[in-house]
Regions:
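Cysteine-nucleophile active-site neighborhood
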Residues: 24-104
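A generic local structural motif
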Residues: 4-8, 39-42, 98, 135-137
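Amide-donor transfer/coupling interface in amidating biosynthetic enzymes
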Residues: 87-148
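Residues at the C-termini of beta-strands that transition into short coil/loop
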Residues: 6-8, 82-84, 113
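Extended, subdomain-level signal for the structured scaffold at the beginning of enzyme domains
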Residues: 1-33
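Flexible, charged surface loops at secondary-structure boundaries
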Residues: 11-15, 47-48, 142-143
């Protein structure tokens, strides 16, 4: 059974088999953060129990300690992890193709964001042959290294 969670209405997500939160604009993210905070303890408990989760784009940023918007205002994430996000004025849009220690095959994705993730000690993507890595200002084709 799929249970939609409507902002402002609340829902009991305890015991969910799968949690999904889709991406939105940076402006919508701030409003979502206020509502999402009520689920902090439940999401953390679900993560500890091994519940499968998919948080895309700006939704994933809410799992960290905080988000600082392009104007310099900071608001809290739920603190599932200690990373922070700092949003800039430049939007990076494009395909991503890279490798990770999580899977034997390459991974393919799409990026549409203006936030840089900071404080991730073990990068998820260890090689990138197409696209931009988080926190980088240049293409990996001219600057090889670790990404995201």
């Amino acid at each position: 059974t799929v249970q939609p969670v409507v902002p402002g209405e609340g829902a009991d997500i305890t015991g969910a088999d799968f949690l999904f939160m889709g991406a939105g604009t940076e402006r919508a993210q701030r409003f979502a953060a206020e509502d999402f905070a009520r689920y902090s303890a439940t999401v953390k408990a679900a993560a500890e129990d091994g519940t499968a989760m998919l948080f895309a784009g700006t939704a994933m940023e809410l799992l960290g300690a905080s988000v600082t918007d392009r104007d310099g205002d900071t608001y809290p994430g739920i603190g599932l992890a200690s990373f922070t996000t700092v949003q800039g004025k430049r939007r990076i849009v494009g395909d991503v193709y890279g490798v990770t220690a999580l899977f034997p095959e390459a991974v393919v994705g799409f990026m549409n964001k203006c936030g840089q993730i900071r404080g991730v000690e073990a990068p998820l993507l260890t090689g990138l042959s197409l696209g931009f890595g988080t926190g980088r200002t240049c293409s990996p084709l001219s600057s090889p290294g670790q990404f995201w």
